Amino acid sequence: MAYQNDVNFIREHVQELDVIDQLLEEIAELQIACCKRKRSLKGTNPTPWTADEAQQSIKEESQDVLNVLCAMGVFGFDDPEKNSTERMKRKMARWVNRVKMKKA
């Protein structure tokens, strides 16, 4: 319940436009981490980050994005009505189908 209390605190004390700014910042940081991961894996454009460091950054930035989405009321872990697990499963299945169709 502590997590939900923290989410509620943010909702009550941070204006929506500021939360949107926070989301944009976190998305940008996630994008940078993804670019670093790609560069480290490809190896043709060196980066000081190792692939493992970039992967860890992707995990961290993804969590930051999810936290902001929870604060916005778009996604929720504690509220079944806002938990998007079923929708995510359907979208993953569609993605798998598209990949399978391309390989066929």
Placement of each model-derived feature along the sequence:
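Flexible "arm" and connector segments at domain edges
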Residues: 1-104
